[in-house]
Amino acid sequence: MAAKRTPTLDRIDVKILAALQRDGRSTIQKLADKVGLSPRACLERVRRLEASGIIAGYQALVELAKLSQPVNVFAEIVLEKQASQGRFEQRLAAIAEVVECWEVSGTIDYIARFVCADLATYEALTSKLIDDPNLGVARIVSHVALRPVRRFTGYPEALLARKLV
C-alpha cells in the first residue's frame, strides 16, 4: 500500500486558507482578488484544498450567549484502565453537549468541553459516565468557565505555511 502523501501548499494556497478562515462566506471573486488569481484558478485551488481534506468544511460561528445562558465546563477525565478507552471515546462522541474532547498526556487522560443548559444537566451527564462500570471512569474534575478570554477563530498563518513548496 502506498504511503499517503501530505499535500504540498504554496504561498497562494496559504493566503486562500487564511482568507477563508477570516471569512468563509467570501465569494470566489472576492477571494481571487485578495490572493491575486483569476476566479477560475482560485476556484480550482479551493476545490483541490477541499478534495484533499485540508478544508474540512465551513461553519458559522454562533454566539450562543445571545440565545441562552449556557454553562461551559472543562472536565479533566481520568480512566481506571486504558482498556476501556475505546468504549469511553464512543460514549463521549455520542453526547451532544460534549463539543470538544482531547486525549492528553500527563496525569489525566482527557480534557472535554461540555456546553450545557445548566449545571444540573452537566452533573447528570457526568454522573452517568462515572456510574457506568463499562467505561472505567476513575474521576472527573470539573472547571466551570466564567468568561471567554480568547476564542478559536482559525489557525495562525505561520502554521498554515509549514509545508510550502
Predicted regions and their residues:
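A compositional/biophysical signature of low hydrophobicity enriched in polar/charged and small residues
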Residues: 1-165
